[in-house]
Amino acid sequence: KYLGDLSLTYEVRGKSYTVSLADITPQVLSNTPDKIQIFWQLPSDVRLYQTFTIKGEEVDWEIDFFNRSHHPVKVTDMWFALPVGALDESIQAHQNLNRHFSLNGNASFFYWTPLTGQGDILLMTMHKGTAIEYATQDGKYYLHSMNAVDRTNDSWRLPSTSKTVQPYEHYMTGFNFTLTGNHEEVKTKIYDKHGVVVKVAPGMVVTPEFEVYCALQSKLPIVELVAEYPEEIQITSLRQKEGDKYIYKFRFSRLGENLITVHYGDDLICFLDFFVTEPLETLIKKRARFIVDKQQHRDSSKWYNGLYSLWDMEKSELLSPDHLGDLREEFMVGGSDDPSNSKPVYVSEKNVIYPNKEEIASLEYYEENFVWGKLQRTDEEYPYPYGIYGSENWYQNRSGKYGGYEDGGSGKGRMWRTFDYTTHFAIYYNLYRIAEDKPIRADLLRR
């Protein structure tokens, strides 16, 4: 793939054409040290020009769709690849780049940072009127996406657009690339390129009781903010500061996704996509309850009895070391690492603040049946008393399947993964706090 690898679908007099520039031999119209212009002849008397121009430390990428026919042309889909900073294993890691992007209509932008975190940052912004409205996982970015988005099965939120080009008219779009020295300069450049700098507090995932404050800054005037659900989204304009900063207060009463469309400049738009959840206390309690009710194995015939495992939402079933489902890695249901450790430590933290007898009993069941003397060695097991098997499967480690204690730490001696120790120390400490602070579990402290 190369920069300028563009594809599009357009309609002329009821007939649809889908073309990829990679399949058509172009004509080079200009090739100088600071500029190259390339031309493609497309079906139905349509021409497409791409021009790359170097201006100091900046590069402009201009796309010109020229309708030379006698009939209107409707561009329904236009997409491009962006092979910039893709992971390249043929070079050293520090020479690669990390890509970050905000896909947000006319205010979309991309930037690439060195993997080392040091050095210049490459920023890509939109030319006036250019908008990115959709992207696919395989790296296709859409300027128009009328056919690309499956509105029946896809949950994509941004609207799809098309562009009608009249006879002998040009449709111009494009991008700018520039270098910045740091993240603050990224924001400054976005502002300079007529983008929108957004700051939101406390964040874009909120609960109904939160008041959300939003600051928008742009060289172009903010015309209006339009709520997706006007009766359930309160938008209050607080003030305009220093001419180019606009301050708003939002309040949401509808759970789920809530979109606010920002109209700015001359018919430009971008979006503020919020997600509104139930109150935090409700969420904390619901999550702990689900873990205990749905995600713990209770089968004394299994070596993983007591394990908190992963729940397959699509199939509504609990996965296990005997049944990985669509998982690729055994460690995800083996009892260690983040997928397993996160659940008991969460339930224990929750019960320090909001104690529940059934949930505390679930933690005790986990410790007695899965951890003590199994995942974790007891104080009487030698060598390595109290050692924790931070592995895909402690049962196989203990059995000697992968070796003994002198095998370098891959068999019976695999107890070197430090992260698991901090997790289980936290669980023990939380159980102590529960027993000490909550009268309903005074019997636990005595144990």
Show the residue positions of the predicted features.
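Short, hydrophobic/aromatic beta-strand segments
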Residues: 69-79, 185-188, 222-227
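Aromatic/hydrophobic beta-strand junction motif of beta-rich domains
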Residues: 206-221
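Beta-strand-rich recognition/accessory modules
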Residues: 39-43, 55, 81-83, 115-204, ...
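Extended, loop-rich substrate-binding clefts of extracytoplasmic carbohydrate-active enzymes
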Residues: 2-62, 66-70, 147-161, 167, ...
